[in-house]
């Protein structure tokens, strides 16, 4: 299986997030950049229960020079949040992984009055500069 190591890492991370209550059902996702080819991103699939997944179910996406993304491998289509995850990675070369969660704790933080921490939605990433990630 191609990209086996990165797929296993993403699968282990999503299962730990589910176990700790950070992600419920299929809401949320984890994406990780490949260490050898930084245009390759492994991301959890869309609409699939995480608890029954295998490494080959993790989607592989290739980031293109024009800013688009192409699903190149995986049993299931990638999360609909691919544009948000890859845009963060494009703007922040130091970021190698993203975790998108709807956990109660993340929601509370996003509702706070900290001017340094701004909530980010997928449409914002496409049309608004992402200042802090």
Where are these regions (language model features)?
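Glycine-rich flexible loops
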Residues: 1-133
């Amino acid at each position: 299986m191609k990209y086996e190591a990165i797929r296993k890492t993403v699968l282990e991370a999503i299962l730990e997030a589910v176990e700790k209550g950070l992600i419920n059902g299929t809401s949320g996702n984890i994406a990780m950049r490949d260490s050898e080819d930084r245009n390759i991103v492994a991301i959890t699939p869309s609409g699939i229960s995480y608890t029954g997944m295998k490494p080959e179910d993790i989607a592989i996406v290739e980031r293109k020079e024009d800013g688009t993304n192409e699903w190149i491998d995986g049993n299931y289509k990638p999360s609909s949040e691919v544009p948000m995850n890859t845009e963060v990675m494009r703007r922040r070369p130091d970021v190698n992984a993203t975790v998108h969660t709807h956990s109660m704790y993340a929601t509370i933080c996003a509702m706070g009055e900290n001017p340094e921490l701004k909530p980010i939605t997928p449409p914002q990433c496409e049309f608004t500069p992402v200042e802090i990630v």
